[in-house]
């Protein structure tokens, strides 16, 4: 039986990054797909610590909050930098990813039609810090921190991929980010996962936007 179980809706959403991580690291996991009908029935929601998904099982350990799950996997699988300095930078990157993801989700779920144009216009300013971080790490030729992949790389990659869907060409002005997306997406196990039905057939969001 797989050591990990992901309990989530039939979307990529906040589980795309952790699925990318697991696939790229050669880990097996079980998916428990929750339909909206099941969720609205209420008993599962009531059993969840914060009343939301994803829920993640690692043996007898139950975790909620997608970034907590990523950090746990980072520690467990050696994806948290090689020392405390790198770990701090990984945390900083991941917090920056979360800031932009929250803005993205607000657009998608509350203001898509009216707010998309302004969001896309402001997007270069939101992406620039990540280009800067890459430029400061070995000329942007490896990962976002150090010379080993971290959980923040998977989270950032997912964020960039969904923004390429939202605003095609949004990375054209950021050569390091563009190359970073291509480089990480070409990792053999990750490339196979990104092309798999398990990923491709899932919508990005739960409301049909993207």
From Swiss-Prot:
The modification Phosphotyrosine is found at residue 4. PROSITE patterns: GST_CTER (PS50405), GST_NTER (PS50404). Residues 83-204 form the GST C-terminal domain. The keyword Nucleus applies. It comes from the Eukaryota. The modification Phosphothreonine is found at residue 62. The modification N6-succinyllysine is found at residues 103, 116. Residues 2-81 form the GST N-terminal domain. Keywords: Acetylation, Cytoplasm, Lipid metabolism, Mitochondrion, Nucleus, Phosphoprotein, Transferase. It is found in: Cytoplasm; Mitochondrion; Nucleus. GO terms for molecular function: dinitrosyl-iron complex binding; fatty acid binding; glutathione peroxidase activity; glutathione transferase activity; S-nitrosoglutathione binding. Belongs to the GST superfamily. Pi family. This is Glutathione S-transferase P. It comes from Pongo abelii.
């Amino acid at each position: 039986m797989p050591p990990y179980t992901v309990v989530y809706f039939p979307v990529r959403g906040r589980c795309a990054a952790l699925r990318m991580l697991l696939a790229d690291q050669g880990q097996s996991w079980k998916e428990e797909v929750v339909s909206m009908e099941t969720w609205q029935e209420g008993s599962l929601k009531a059993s969840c610590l914060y009343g939301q998904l994803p829920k993640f099982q690692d043996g007898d350990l139950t975790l909620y909050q997608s970034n907590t799950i990523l950090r746990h996997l980072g520690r467990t699988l050696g994806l948290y930098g090689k020392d405390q300095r790198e770990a701090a930078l990984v945390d900083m990157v991941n917090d920056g990813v979360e800031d932009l993801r929250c803005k993205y989700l607000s657009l998608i779920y509350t203001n898509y039609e009216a707010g998309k144009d302004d969001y896309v216009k402001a997007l270069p300013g939101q992406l620039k810090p990540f280009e800067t971080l890459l430029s400061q790490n070995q000329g942007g030729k490896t990962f976002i921190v150090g010379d080993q992949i971290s959980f923040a790389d998977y989270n950032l990659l997912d964020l960039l991929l969904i923004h390429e869907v939202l605003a095609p060409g949004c990375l054209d002005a950021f050569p390091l980010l563009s190359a970073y997306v291509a480089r990480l997406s070409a990792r053999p196990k990750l490339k196979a996962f990104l092309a798999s039905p398990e990923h491709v057939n899932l919508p990005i969001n739960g409301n049909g936007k993207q």
